[in-house]
C-alpha cells in the first residue's frame, strides 16, 4: 500500500542521522492524505525511542484514537532538537517541513572556506585519494565557515550541490556536516555524547540523474534506474546533487560549520566516530584513484541548510 492510500491515524518516528531508514517516515508523512498523522524526529537510531518522552506520546495517541479521549494536546510534529554535548530539547511543530523554514546556502570557496557569498574570482581544485586513511588522518577535503554571530537552529532537509571529477569511472560522494567550537573541537551531537554530525548524506556519481517530478526544491530525488546509469569519463567534470537526510541541531554563537566531502563514510580524524559503512552492502568501493572537488565562479558548489526560527521547547525527559 502506498502512503497516498492510507487514511488511518498514523504515528511515525524518523531517525535523523541513521542514513536511509528514517526517509520512509518523512515521505509517508508528506504524502498521506489523512489529517490524523503525527511525526517524531528522534536522534540517531530507534533504540532510545522507547523512553519516558516517547512512551507518553504513544499513550496519548492511543488514548485519542482508541479510547476517544480528546483532551490530550498531542503535537503533530515533535523534534528532538540536538544542542550538542549530550544536550537537547523537544520542539513542538504543526507540520513538516517546518513553517517558516529558510533554505540558506553556504558556498565552497577557493580558500577552503564556507561562505554565504559565492566565489566570483578564484578557481581551485581540491584533490583527495579515494581510500580512507588511518586513525587521525583526514579523509577527503573540508571547508570551514566563519564563526556564527548568533545561535542558529537547523531542522529539515539539507542538500549539497557539488562539481566533481575522478580518475576512476565512478565516485562515492559522502557529505558530512559538523559543528566545531571555539577551540576547533568537534561538537558531538549524539544524545549520549558520542561524536555524530549535524547531518550527512551520500551519492554514487553514476547515479546522479535526477527525477524532475519527484525532486523538490529542498530535496533532490534520484532515479536510480539502469537506463540512467552514467559512469564518469577520464576528463568528465560533472555536477551532482547530494541528498542529505533530514536532521535537527542548533549551532551556537561562536561555533563554525565544517563540511566534509569524502570518498567514504568514515572520518578518521574524528576520534570515536564509527558510522555504518553503507557501501559495503554493495561491494563496489572505489579505492584506487583520486577524486577532485572543483571550486570557482563557473563551478557550482554549496550546501543548502534548513534554517528555522529559533525557539526553546520543553525540557527533555528521556532516560
Where are these regions (language model features)?
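Glycine/threonine-rich phosphate-binding loop and adjacent beta-strand/alpha-helix elements that clamp
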Residues: 54-56, 66-319
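Active-site-proximal helices and loops of the catalytic beta/alpha 8
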Residues: 40, 52-55
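Catalytic histidine neighborhood in serine/cysteine hydrolases
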Residues: 32-47
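Conserved alpha/beta-hydrolase "acid-adjacent" motif
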Residues: 19-24
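Short beta-strand/loop motif that positions the catalytic acidic residue
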Residues: 6, 12-14
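Accessory cap/linker subdomain of secreted extracellular hydrolases
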Residues: 1-5
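Acidic beta-to-alpha connecting loop that harbors the catalytic carboxylate
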Residues: 16-18, 44-45, 264
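Amphipathic alpha-helical segments in well-structured domains
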Residues: 25, 54-59
Amino acid at each position: 500500500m502506498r502512503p497516498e492510500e492510507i487514511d488511518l491515524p498514523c504515528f511515525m518516528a524518523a531517525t535523523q542521522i541513521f542514513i536511509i531508514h528514517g526517509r520512509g517516515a518523512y515521505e509517508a508523512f508528506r504524502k498521506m492524505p489523512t489529517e490524523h498523522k503525527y511525526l517524531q524526529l528522534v536522534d540517531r537510531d530507534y533504540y532510545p525511542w522507547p523512553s519516558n518522552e516517547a512512551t507518553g506520546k504513544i499513550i496519548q495517541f492511543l488514548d485519542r484514537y482508541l479510547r476517544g479521549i480528546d483532551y490530550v494536546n498531542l503535537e503533530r510534529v515533535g523534534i528532538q532538537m540536538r544542542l550538542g554535548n549530550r544536550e537537547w530539547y523537544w520542539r513542538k511543530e504543526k507540520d513538516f517541513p517546518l513553517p517558516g523554514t529558510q533554505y540558506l546556502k553556504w558556498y565552497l570557496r577557493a580558500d577552503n572556506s564556507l561562505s554565504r557569498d559565492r566565489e566570483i574570482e578564484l578557481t581551485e581544485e581540491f584533490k583527495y585519494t579515494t581510500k580512507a586513511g588511518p586513525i587521525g588522518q583526514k579523509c577527503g577535503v573540508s571547508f570551514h565557515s566563519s564563526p556564527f554571530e548568533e545561535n542558529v537552529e537547523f531542522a529539515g532537509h539539507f542538500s549539497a550541490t557539488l562539481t566533481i571529477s575522478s580518475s576512476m569511472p565512478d565516485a562515492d560522494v559522502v557529505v558530512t556536516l559538523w559543528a566545531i567550537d571555539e577551540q576547533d573541537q568537534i561538537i558531538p551531537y549524539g544524545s549520549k555524547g558520542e561524536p555524530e554530525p549535524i547531518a550527512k548524506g551520500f551519492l554514487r556519481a553514476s547515479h546522479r540523474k535526477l527525477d524532475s517530478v519527484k525532486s523538490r526544491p529542498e530535496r533532490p530525488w534520484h532515479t536510480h534506474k539502469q537506463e540512467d546509469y552514467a559512469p564518469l569519463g577520464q576528463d568528465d567534470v560533472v555536477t551532482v546533487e547530494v541528498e542529505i537526510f533530514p536532521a535537527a541541531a542548533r549551532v551556537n554563537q561562536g561555533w563554525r560549520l565544517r563540511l566534509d566531502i569524502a570518498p567514504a563514510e568514515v572520518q578518521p580524524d574524528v576520534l570515536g566516530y564509527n558510522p555504518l559503512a553503507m557501501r559495503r552492502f554493495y561491494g563496489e568501493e572505489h579505492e584506487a584513484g583520486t577524486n577532485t572537488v572543483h571550486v570557482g565562479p563557473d563551478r557550482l558548489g554549496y550546501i543548502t541548510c534548513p534554517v528555522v526560527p529559533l525557539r526553546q521547547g520543553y525540557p527533555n525527559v528521556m532516560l
